């Protein structure tokens, strides 16, 4: 089906992204996978190419473009290239809105220029060893000491945790307040008592550094509070729809790409004296996946447009995240199966797509949490 949501400007941007991937990412990606981390030079290159801070106002060095379709193009092309390790979506679409929407003028001038050049890499630290989806379980504290915050606690599974120069930390500022006693406080590289643990060894997305973070009596200036004190819960809920849309966009793009490479494979691979594509079972498998992808694509494109226009609600963002990522997981499994033993070999793209994509139904809100949000809203 012909997609109708992109203009010539979006198409030109897509070509820019593809050129960037070809020149600056793919030649180095295998080394990054071995190293378990992307080079900082790649971030600087992304900044020079104008791929960072797409929605940041021009006065702070950004693109000044809040059209989410550009972010969708970026997510689609990085997914198709099999290069999720350079986490531009995390930087642009998850942390970016907190800085542009909540930061004071002084904070914007301090942080946003580096955000857009790639000199300042960002992360957000919510998850803790004992608190994932349950924000009320957060134990990291930020004690008001008059002229500074004193932060103690730990975080885990933090994307960009090793590289990050600026970490948005979710911490308790009113311990008895539960989820409504949380605040967002920015901790910068070099803060005394702020330590990074090991770069965690994951089954996929190995070049995307994921770390434990530790805070031992970390003194943070009072002016590093982001947004309202005790306002983190509302701030997080406001921005989660965009995070989930970014994940959903990558999910359907991955499913479509897996279907594409598997369709090519079954046409070329022979068994029992003929191409696999001549077997009825194979044709049924391809037909089912193609139909599921087409239906999901139609829904996702509608959600992309709605989000670009500011009309997408949390329920439909949750539907998109749940459905697209679960589809990605199913398609990855079926496509690997159709590759037979070759699908289990790391040199085949389907193998890496299988392991890289498995996290999609977990981070940004698990499938189970998405269903809870949808069901709770419909039955309220």
Model regions: which residues?
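Long, acidic (Asp/Glu-rich), low-complexity accessory segments flanking structured domains
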Residues: 213-235
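A short core secondary-structure module
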Residues: 148, 152-196
């Amino acid at each position: 089906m012909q997609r109708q949501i992109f203009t010539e400007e979006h198409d030109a941007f897509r070509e820019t992204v593809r050129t960037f991937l070809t020149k600056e990412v793919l030649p180095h990606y295998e080394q990054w996978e071995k190293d378990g981390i992307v080079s900082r030079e790649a971030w600087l290159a992304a900044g020079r190419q104008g791929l960072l801070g797409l929605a940041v106002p021009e006065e702070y060095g950004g693109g000044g473009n809040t059209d989410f379709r550009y972010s969708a193009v970026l997510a689609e092309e990085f997914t198709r290239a099999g290069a999720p390790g350079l986490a531009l979506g995390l930087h642009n679409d998850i942390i970016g809105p907190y800085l542009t929407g909540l930061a004071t003028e002084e904070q914007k001038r301090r942080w946003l220029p580096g955000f857009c050049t790639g000199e300042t890499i960002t992360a957000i630290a919510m998850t803790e060893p004992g608190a994932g989806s349950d924000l009320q379980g957060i134990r990291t504290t930020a004690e008001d000491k008059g002229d500074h915050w004193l932060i103690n606690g730990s975080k885990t599974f933090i994307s960009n945790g090793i590289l990050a120069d600026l970490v948005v930390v979710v911490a308790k500022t009113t311990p008895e307040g539960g989820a409504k006693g949380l605040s967002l406080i920015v901790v910068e590289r070099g803060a005394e008592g702020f330590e990074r643990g090991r770069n965690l060894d994951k089954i996929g997305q190995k070049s995307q550094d994921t770390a434990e973070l530790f805070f031992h009596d970390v003194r943070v200036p009072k002016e590093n509070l982001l947004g309202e004190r005790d306002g983190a819960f509302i701030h997080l809920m406001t921005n989660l729809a965009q995070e989930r849309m970014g994940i959903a966009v990558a999910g359907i793009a991955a499913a479509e790409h897996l279907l594409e490479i598997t369709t090519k494979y079954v046409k070329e691979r022979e068994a029992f004296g003929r191409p696999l594509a001549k077997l009825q079972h194979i044709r049924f498998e391809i037909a089912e996946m193609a139909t599921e992808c087409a239906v999901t694509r139609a829904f996702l494109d509608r959600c992309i447009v709605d989000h670009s226009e500011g009309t997408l609600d949390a329920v439909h963002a949750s539907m998109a995240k749940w459905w697209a990522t679960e589809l990605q997981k199913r398609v990855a499994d079926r496509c690997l199966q159709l590759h037979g033993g070759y699908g289990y070999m790391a040199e085949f793209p389907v193998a890496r797509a299988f392991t890289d994509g498995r996290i999609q139904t977990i981070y940004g809100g698990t499938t189970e949490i998405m269903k809870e949000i949808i069901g709770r809203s419909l039955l309220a």
